[in-house]
């Protein structure tokens, strides 16, 4: 039975208890939100994971993608990237390999982590079609479903499945046109197949069969956003909104089956459109958890897109997005390496946390408040303890140690806090009344 069906029947599962403890919320609240579809807990019943809650009134979660490419196929590096992502604080992983032995890579990653792991099954179907017949346009619709089931059996916890691309969506995309085109890899595979074969999307037509599979293994559907813009000038266009309408309808059908859903959102979007997109998605999809990809809020900062994404992530979390896919410095340039992954997770976590603070400083800002007290008392040990990455903070100060232990080399004895502690705080509260 799925987490959602258990919740609908009034049962609090161990996964719900874990999420409640992590979020410091009542387990019954988590159950009610899972039953409504407002919170998802990706937790495949084929393997053990540490449960992570994604959705309303929870801390904004961060996903890190890993995976090989056709140019760089190094399983050891991908395992290192997964480990580094976890150490940096990623809440989930997505395994998106397109090069090498895809089954072995996926299964090895799953064996080496307790984090929830996501995938995009159409990648494997397309790769196999290309290897066999030379092009993704030769994909067999039966293979699309077979790969979904195979990956579900392996233990994948959430899947990005491109069910919402249909002929009407493509018609609107074609009529309107775009500066940046269509940049979803899975969306490009499905769209090219539809155009070449002059047929409806098999994943849309056979959505009930998709639901049969994911319900059996309690896989959370991450409803893929194939029509997301790849350039700021294309954001929030008719094709994207048309797909969102379809996504909302598919969410309804999934909930009727007790299948958990997350809805993916834009990747490239101006800051001023973020709130609008979140409001529309929450309305259309009846408060399903929203998974934003980045987002990228300016298109001209390659090599620093992790910073761009952190800015977007802060705005997304602030306005109610629930799940953010990280972006690394290698975005738009190359397959990310281990250090790129670390920088991407760090940047996105900072952005997501900043957005959470705008929603509820007291609840999400315990360490921020404690840090203020530690800084005022010049207690460096406590400052490290409340830092998001304590070792990094300590390493910088230790590299350039101050003469006075209670200061740093930025100000030394001219430290404003030290001066205030010595003089202003000792003054009588009524000293400045006259």
Swiss-Prot record:
UniProt-annotated binding residues for [4Fe-4S] cluster: 408, 411, 415
Cofactor: how and how many bound: Binds 1 [4Fe-4S] cluster per subunit. The cluster is coordinated with 3 cysteines and an exchangeable S-adenosyl-L-methionine.
Alphabetic keyword roster: 4Fe-4S, Iron, Iron-sulfur, Lyase, Metal-binding, S-adenosyl-L-methionine, Thiamine biosynthesis, Zinc
Pfam families registered for this protein in UniProt: ThiC_Rad_SAM
Keyword Zinc-finger: no
Similarity comment: Belongs to the ThiC family.
Protein name: Phosphomethylpyrimidine synthase 2
Organism of origin: Methanosphaera stadtmanae (strain ATCC 43021 / DSM 3091 / JCM 11832 / MCB-3)
Protein encoded by which gene: thiC2
